[in-house]
């Protein structure tokens, strides 16, 4: 998945501490259908916190733990959630979106 639309890097406002390591950014890859199991597509599109806390660890590098997800800065969770939703949009929809 070298295509830029299949992978996004999110720079964290509040780094995650894992032992002596600071995680300052998380790479999210476009989920395959299996990574969405146990969630509802509508919940993901609504950026439901529970749905995102299920899906994001499955598609993140490094893989985030449940505890790390629970302690995320809400701004960082929102930034990652936006990227997850963007992955689910068709290319034709993305082409029609305004760019910054």
Predicted regions: what is each one?
Residues 2-100:
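Short, surface-exposed, charged amphipathic helix/loop patches that serve as local interaction elements
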């Amino acid at each position: 998945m070298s295509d830029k639309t299949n992978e996004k890097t999110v720079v964290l406002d509040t780094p995650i501490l894992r032992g002596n390591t600071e995680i300052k950014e998380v790479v999210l890859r476009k989920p395959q259908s299996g990574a969405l199991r146990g969630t509802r597509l509508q919940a993901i599109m609504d950026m439901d916190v529970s749905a995102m806390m299920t899906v994001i660890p499955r598609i993140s590098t490094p893989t985030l733990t449940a505890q790390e997800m629970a302690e995320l800065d809400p701004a960082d969770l929102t930034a990652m959630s936006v990227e997850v939703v963007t992955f689910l949009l068709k290319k034709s929809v993305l082409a029609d979106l305004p760019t910054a």
